[in-house]
Design a protein with these regions (language model features):
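Amphipathic alpha-helical polymerization modules
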Residues: 1-147, 151, 372-474
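Short solvent-exposed loop/turn micro-motifs enriched in small/polar/acidic residues
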Residues: 22, 183, 265, 333-336
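Polar, low-complexity export/assembly segments characteristic of proteins
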Residues: 24, 28-31, 35, 130, ...
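Aromatic side chains
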Residues: 63, 134-136, 188, 198, ...
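Intrinsically disordered, low-complexity regulatory segments in eukaryotic proteins
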Residues: 147, 153-160
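Extended, beta-strand-rich, solvent-exposed assembly scaffolds of outer structural proteins
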Residues: 157-329
Length: 474
């Protein structure tokens, strides 16, 4: 029979006390920290699972933040496109109002000031930033999407022809320079007394140029250096129909222009006005300011002003007094076509930006150019140019509407992704909590049991120690 000595009993009881004390430490630590697994040694398998859950939660948090930032970018982008849409709608209303012949040059120049502000507001919308980063520049987020930098428009005041709004026939009309040396630069009207007879009148001088001419569809109508061709489309003109030819240069000199100092460019319309065959003035039409007067003209020489270099070259006829040449810097896209992708799941991404060249300057219409064309047409009192502008605005509004719809669909998708990530985070957190977090009711019960067991073990140990000591003293 195995005999257990007093010392062995004491050692067993002491080991039991130490085990209970270790368990008490773990339970008290779990109650204090709220975690029942605090180190790998507590539960190695559970600790490994907890670390995996933490990594998953970190990835979810990063993706949720990226999705949230993407939604913010797209929401602001949608707002900017909406602002642009409102601007273009107003610009179209102005173009429709000013296309008629009832507005005076002064009235058109006055309304051009509003158009200029619309242009600047449109540029601001296209150059919207979030967190100091441009929204519509692709990957080039530190570069403004649109700026005056490299493109300049330049043209002489060439003749153009337009049908009166109240014409009842359907006739196409073109005008070109036939003999530059015979040009007067004046305004003309071709008026039909019936479907086969017309007169040509110089509206500037009041003189009749051609009288009782017989109309033939597609035939040349030549006068004062101009050639007009009227063509049935599909029917011909009717009595009372009228076609007007705008004032134009009396020469066929041409102009080109380029940027000389980009930092000096302003979004203005400039006019080079010839006061004689050898001298010209330069006027800022936008601000109605004369930049210089009495400049000496030499064919092919550089004309430098406001960051622009213009060159006028003689044709068969040198520029004449009254000839006008218009110059303006144009806005152009400065970004790239980069798509900023956001990963919402392993290997799956969604674009979080829209490219300005596919919203404001394309894919169908360059709306900044259309706004500049509207302003120039009003400043130069050429309502015949407004029909093209109106058509561009109509197409451009569809372009902006399509862009808003595309952005809206992306925002909706991001909202759904955010909801999915939130749900995944909650589910993962619950699973982690089941393994890691303290069950306070269970732990409190364990604490009470262990404390009772400890007291009992200590009492037993004490008694056994007393017995051992008494036996020793005997």
């Amino acid at each position: 029979m195995l005999r257990i000595t007093n010392q062995q009993q004491i050692d067993l009881l002491n080991g039991n006390v130490q085990r209970i004390q270790r368990d008490l430490f773990r339970v008290r630590e779990a109650l204090a920290s709220g975690k029942k697994v605090n180190r790998p040694s507590d539960e190695p398998i559970a600790f490994e699972q907890i670390m995996k859950f933490r990594n998953v939660l970190n990835n979810i948090e990063k993706r949720s933040l990226a999705v949230s930032e993407a939604a913010s970018r797209l929401n602001l982008s949608e707002s900017a496109v909406g602002t642009a849409e409102t601007i273009i709608q107003r610009a179209k209303e102005i173009a429709l109002q000013q296309r008629n012949d009832t507005s005076s040059a002064a009235e058109r120049q006055a309304i051009a000031k509003e158009v200029h502000q619309l242009l600047l507001s449109f540029v601001d919308a296209a150059n919207t930033k979030i967190n100091e980063r441009y929204l519509f520049s692709g990957f080039e987020t530190q570069t403004a999407a649109f700026a005056l930098s490299s493109s300049v428009s330049a043209s002489g005041r060439s003749p153009s022809i337009s049908a009166n709004d109240d014409n009842t026939g359907t006739t196409s009309a073109t005008v070109s320079i036939q003999t530059a040396g015979s040009l007067t630069g004046n305004k003309y009207a071709i008026t039909f007394s019936d479907s086969t007879t017309f007169d040509v009148k110089n509206l500037t001088t009041g003189a009749t140029v051609l009288s009782s001419q017989t109309y033939t569809s597609g035939a040349n109508i030549d006068f004062d250096g101009l050639r007009v061709v009227l063509t049935n489309n599909p029917s011909g003109p009717l009595g009372g129909d009228e076609f007007q030819i705008t004032p134009h240069n009396a020469s066929d000199a041409t102009i080109t222009a380029s940027v000389s100092t980009a930092s000096a460019l302003q979004p203005n319309v400039y006019e080079i006005r010839f006061t004689s065959a050898t001298a010209f003035d330069i006027v800022n039409l936008t601000d109605n300011q004369v930049l210089s007067t009495g400049n000496s003209y030499t064919s092919g020489a550089n004309i430098v002003f406001a960051g622009i270099t213009a060159v006028i070259t003689d044709g068969t006829v040198t520029p004449q007094a009254g000839d006008l040449f218009r110059v303006r810097p144009n806005y152009s896209y400065q970004g790239d076509t980069g798509s900023i992708a956001v990963e919402y799941e392993d290997g799956k991404t969604i674009a979080s930006n829209v490219v300005g060249s596919q919203v404001f300057s394309g894919p169908d219409v360059d709306l900044l150019n259309a706004l500049q064309n509207l302003e120039q047409a009003l400043l130069t009192n050429t309502p015949s140019d407004l029909s093209t502008v109106i058509g561009n605005f109509t197409t451009g509004l569809d372009q902006l509407t399509d862009a808003r719809a595309d952005i809206g669909s992306k925002v909706n998708r991001l909202d759904r992704l955010a909801e999915g990530l939130d749900l995944l985070a909650v589910t993962t957190q619950d699973e982690r909590s089941t393994i890691e977090d303290t069950d306070y009711a269970e732990a409190s019960s364990q604490l009470a049991t262990l404390e009772t067991n400890l007291q009992a073990s200590l009492l037993t140990l004490s008694r056994q120690f007393d017995i051992s000591l008494l036996n020793f003293l005997r």
